[in-house]
Amino acid sequence: MIKEELIVKTTALPQSRIALELEIPSNTCKSCVNETINSISRSAKIPGFRLGKIPKQVLIQRIGITQLHASALEKIIDKSWNQALKMESIEPLSEPELVDGFESILKFFNPEKPLKITLQTDIAPEFKLKKSKGLSVEIKKSKFDPKSIDEALEKSRNQLANIIPVNNRPAKLGDIAVVSFKGVYKDSKKEIDGGSSDSMDLELEKNKMIPGFVEGIVGMKIDDNKTLTLRFPEDYSHEDSRGKEAIFDISLKDLKEKELPELNDDFAKQSGNKDSLKELKKDIEKQLKENFDNTQKNIKVEALMDALSKELDAEIPKAMIDIEVRNNIEQTAQRFAQQGMDIKSTFTPELVKSLAESTRPQAEKNVQRNLALKALSEREKITVDNEEIDQKMKEYEDEISKSPKQIDIQKLKDVVRNDLLQEKLITWLEENSAVKEINEKATKLTTKTTTKATTKKGVKTKSKPKVNKKEKN
C-alpha cells in the first residue's frame, strides 16, 4: 500500500505574506476523525454505557456528525499546518488565516477524500541594505557647561533645605504654597478632570502647572482667594484640554519657604559624604562629564542608527510591529508588577489599547532598526563567538551564585550575545561613517537628565544587561 503524503505549494504575497496551498491525504483525515472519536469516547457519559466503552455509531449519533467533523477538522488543519511549516522551513510571524473560512470547508468535508485548503500567514521580510559604508550624519556640537556643576549643587541644597512657615508676606517664586483650587472649562463650565484639589503643596516655580497658574498665585497672601482665566497649551498632555480656556478658583491656605544650607564643608559631608566642598565639586564634575560624554555618544549613535535604517530595503509586515508593541506592553506590565501593582486591575482593556496606540510609532522604529542591524551583521559578517560570551558571563558569576535556580542561564547568554553583537555593530558604524558636528551653544546637563541618557530599545553605551530570572509556574 502506497503511503499518501501531504502536498504543499507556496506562493509569495505582498507585504511579506505567504500562501500555503495544502492537499491533505484522506488517510490523515480519517486518522484525525478516529482520534477525535476516541478522545471524546474517553470522557463522554451516556446512560447505559461504561466510560470509554461507547460504540462508535452511538457516539456519532449522540454528538452529531457535524460537531465530530468540526473537532476533527481543527485537528487536521493544525497537524497539517505544522507539518507544512517544517517541510518548507517557514517561520510564521502570525497565526494562519484560512482563506475559504472554516464553515465553508466544514460544509464539504469528507474524510474519505483528500482535503484541499489554503492558509496565509506573515513571515519575516527579505531585507538588505542599499548601503552600509560611508553613511554621513550631522549632529549638534556641544561642550560641557561648568554651570551645570553649580546647578547640581543648588539642586542638592534644595533637597536638604529646611521648610519653615511664612506668615508676614505675600507668596513669591521659590515658596511652597498650600492651595485648594477648582477648575472648569470656560465654555461648558464642565469640571476639568484632575483640575481640582482640596489641598496641594505647590512649589512656585516657572513652567509648573499650565502657563499663568503659578504666576497667579505669586502675590497672594494666606486666606486670599483669586479667580484665574487661563488657556491650556496646544500640546497639553490631555488631548481633551488642548487649547481650551479654563477658569480656576484658587485659595491660598498656607505658605512655606525653604531655608537653604550654606555651601561649606558641612554641606559636603551631609550631601555627598565628602570631607570638603572642593572634593564634592570635583566628584560632581567627574560624574556630570561622564554623563555628558555618554549623552553625546548616544546622540551620535541615534543619528547613525537613523541613517542606517533609511538604507534598509524591506517591506515590514504589520505582524512584526504588532509583536513589538505586545512585547513593550508586557515589559511595562512586568515593571509595574515588580513595584507591587495589581496588573489585572491596572491594565484595563482601555489602557492596553491606549498603550498600543501610543507606543506603535516607536515600535515600528525599533523593528526597522533591528532589521537594519541584522542586515548589517550579515552583510559585513560581524558575529560574536562563544569565547566572547563566556568572558562577559564572568561578570555575572557572583549574581548567578547567589540565586542559581532563579536565573535562566540560556536567556542571560542570549542577552549577552545580543548586547555584544550590538556593540560591535555600532563600533563598526562609527568607524565606517562620517559624523559632522555643527556648532551649538554649550549644553547644560543636570544630574537628573544625564542619568537617563540612553537611546531607545537598548541601544546604549557601556551597558550591562539585566539578569533574567526564570518564571515561576
Swiss-Prot record:
Residues 442-473 are annotated as: Disordered. Residues 454-467 have a biased composition (Basic residues). Residues 444-453 have a biased composition (Low complexity). GO terms for molecular function: peptidyl-prolyl cis-trans isomerase activity; protein folding chaperone; ribosome binding. SUPFAM superfamilies: FKBP-like, Triger factor/SurA peptide-binding domain-like, Trigger factor ribosome-binding domain. Residues 174-261 form the PPIase FKBP-type domain. The keyword Cytoplasm applies. InterPro entries: PPIase_dom_sf, PPIase_FKBP_dom, Trig_fac, Trigger_fac_C, Trigger_fac_C_sf, Trigger_fac_ribosome-bd_bac, Trigger_fac_ribosome-bd_sf, Trigger_fact/SurA_dom_sf. Keywords: Cell cycle, Cell division, Chaperone, Cytoplasm, Isomerase, Rotamase. It is found in: Cytoplasm. Signal peptide: none annotated. It catalyses: [protein]-peptidylproline (omega=180) = [protein]-peptidylproline (omega=0). GO terms for biological process: 'de novo' cotranslational protein folding; cell division; chaperone-mediated protein folding; protein transport; protein unfolding. Consists of 3 domains; the N-terminus binds the ribosome, the middle domain has PPIase activity, while the C-terminus has intrinsic chaperone activity on its own. Belongs to the FKBP-type PPIase family. Tig subfamily. This is Trigger factor. It comes from Prochlorococcus marinus subsp. pastoris (strain CCMP1986 / NIES-2087 / MED4). The gene is tig.
